[in-house]
Swiss-Prot record:
Belongs to the conotoxin O1 superfamily. This is Conotoxin LiCr95. It holds the Pfam family Conotoxin. Its main location: secreted. One of its GO terms (molecular function) is toxin activity. One of its GO terms (cellular component) is extracellular region.
């Protein structure tokens, strides 16, 4: 009797584990790499594309998003410069 109860509990536990870990892919794209390729072709869709500041824009030691990665100090303050 105890063995039967233990087997039933084990089967219920394994069934519950399978139900919670199944992939619910309903309504999703079959191949996620294809979705990534589409995003790479269209940069407006991609969140991975970063914008940079052109030469002449203001920058600082802590905020340097210059396209050239060069932030030089001038009389008017630090600005992005050309390489």
């Amino acid at each position: 009797m105890k063995l039967t109860c233990a087997l039933i509990v084990a089967m219920l536990f394994l069934t519950a584990c399978q139900l919670t870990t199944t992939d619910d892919s309903r309504g999703r794209q079959k191949y996620p790499t294809e979705r990534l390729r589409v995003k790479m072709r269209n940069p407006k869709l991609s969140k991975l594309t970063k914008t940079c500041d052109p030469p002449g824009d203001s920058c600082s030691r802590w905020y340097n998003h210059c396209c050239s990665k060069l932030c030089t100090s001038r009389n008017s303050g630090p600005t992005c410069s050309r390489p």
